[in-house]
Amino acid sequence: AYRWFLRMGLTEKVPDASTLSQNRLRRFNDSEVFQQIFDHIVGQALANGMANGRVLYTDSTHLKADANPRKAVNELRPEGVSEYLEQLNAAVEADRKKHEKKPLPAVKNKPESEAAVKNTKVSTTDPESGFMHRDNKPQGFFYLDHRTVDGKHGIIVDTHVTPGNVHDSQPYIGRLERQIQRFGLEPVAAGVDAGYVTAAVCHLTQEMGVALVPGYRRPNKGQNVYQKKHFTYDPERDVYTCPAERLLTYGTTDRNGYRHYRSDARVCVECPLRDNCTKNKKGEKTLTRHVWEEAKEKANALRLTKWGKKIYARRKETVERSFADAKQHHGHRYARFRGLMKV
């Protein structure tokens, strides 16, 4: 069968096994041939109606790195920079201008030795893997496979590997843009789990004309009885109203894209609900609202519609099934090689 596949005659000499393996290991290093083959297969699926790119489902799964979790060192590594920093900076400046605030001073480009760093656990066996520490997930060195499948028949249209300590939302927009540009897709909806629900992802998907249908995540309960959900936002006046019918007015917009709304401490001191509202020593209540919070609210509202529920329900039949098949039948639980490129 392999002679027929390789178009070899019955008497021709078969290449040695090492010839094939070394070709795979050396010849195509630093090339995009594997990506090109993958893209060609996806193109064939689209051309033959097996996929249509109308609804895309994205999720990530962890692959255990070939690395002993006990063989690790702590290193000071540069802090990760958001993939959406440029768009966020523009939105922050526009919002401050709208509220007649001075522009924020430009961030100075510090030399590498003075850049912001954080203490990071690094494997001595596979330094390119990432130490994963998530709720209800195993702890150790892992890689993440960020996968997107088509909603029609579950055809994989994109896969992207990162270290295990990369947040799901970071590569999402870049990968979605690549799929749209590479294959000419026109998606109307994208189904994702709660890990992708950030203000940036919600805003940028809506800017692309894609309806984001997210999962639900129970918010962390703070120390106060009255949470943010008990305060009502008025977009016309740009104020929050507290349970005691008092106003929290706009103060400023910080570099991270959050507007700060503060109450009048003189009013809060005499409020009978104060003990359930804030523990601030000044008697002042502060709420934050992202400049792209409206997009996040729209995504959550869409999740509750009949159409949104129907779209989200198919995640388990598409991307979750794809991961289950990969793990159960194709050894996708463990990374057989070391290093990001080989994984």
Q: Which residues are covered by each model-predicted region?
A:
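DNA-recognition alpha helix
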Residues: 1-5
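Anion-binding and metal-coordination hotspots
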Residues: 7-343
